[in-house]
Amino acid sequence: NIQALKNDLRKTKELLQSEKEKTHTVQAMIEECRDKQRQAEQERDYAEFLKEEKDWLQDYCLFMAIKNEQKGICWIDWPEELKNRHSKAVKEAEKELAEEIEFYRFQQYCFTTQWRKLKAYANKKGISIIGDVPIYVALDSSDAWANPEMLQFDEDYDPKAVAGCPPDAFSATGQLWGNPLYDWKALKKDGYGWWVQRMTHCLELYDVVRIDHFRGFDEYYAIPYGDKTAERGKWEEGPGMDLFHTLDKKIKDLRVIAEDLGFLTESVLEMLKESGYPGMKVLQFAFDGSEDSSYLPYKYDHNCVVYTGTHDNETTKGWLENLQGHDLKFVREYINCYEQPVNDCVWALIRTALSSVADLAVIPIQDYLCLGNEARMNAPSTLGDNWKWRLTANQISETTLYHMREVTRIYGRLAKASEEKETDEIANAEEEERQDNDQNSKIVE
């Protein structure tokens, strides 16, 4: 009997081992099918991506591949046939650099896929993303190389003039940006097609677009190409509202913030008003030596966006630490912080922005954290440590989060979803308390 039991046990083990191997085989087959399915889905996604982004993707990838082959030099210094996009030279480059072109395509696909997931996650959490879009393209860019007809180039594809700003109290020789200028007549003849494509694409990446140098659509400053300063530039007429009427017709739900900082003419103010786009108000600009600045909060209307400071400003703490004399005295008077520490003044300015009538308030995270200029994002017209500051996971404490949320709630700026969640949480807490009270009453009885 014992031997029979041993035999049965051995057979059972063999059977179990066989079943286990079968299970492993089935699992391996299932995993292989899943891998093939994922690969097929990715291939379909990739093909769809190439189709969706065809307006710019091929030109960009070809440009990058050629630029890499040309050791990174600006395209206006490429061999003539490539610089001028001769058909034969372009076809040869596409053939010879096919592998590198495919690398840049797939790189853009990976980024776009990841970005879309990130944006979808943010939107699901009730967070909208504002994208910052410069008015001009860079000279050394695929946009300029692939679309020379929309820019002010001569017959050799060199710029006739470049962008910048005239001399003022801050710069005796002005600002020489060096971007090629648009040929607005040519763009209008094409129905502003490139701008329609650009803004459509931007609004796929972002929920709201902030257009830099909005006044440049009314008048733009043109500096002769090759000049070392901006002193010989002159103002030229831009497209004005004609461009924005076209964009409004072609693009559904066009959400724009107009960067309208600096000196503005009456025609620029009229264009901003007619467009209906909100302009910008920067609190740091309100305390500039006078007590009558248009950036003071009591002068705002609803249709604007208030910032304590932008990426181009000092942090609010750094700005306060560098402020002196009358301006420092006035800002402390304005926010009712006469002797308080600088961090208290930072929070008072945050409250000033949030309590204003501006429809939208933007507070840099550096200000919520009361960081100094070691955390400044960008110092315009300088080289060095710009755009290197990073927020780390351990910098935001639960206490800071609580204060951020409370000050947002107090001034009625909580997102609707957050308000509803808070209301539900309060209602649930009240219901739990009522049930506890009922239970206690029964116990007493």
Label the predicted regions.
Residues 17, 21-109, 137-362, 366-373, ...:
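Alpha-amylase-like alpha-glycosidases and glucanotransferases acting on alpha-linked glucans and related
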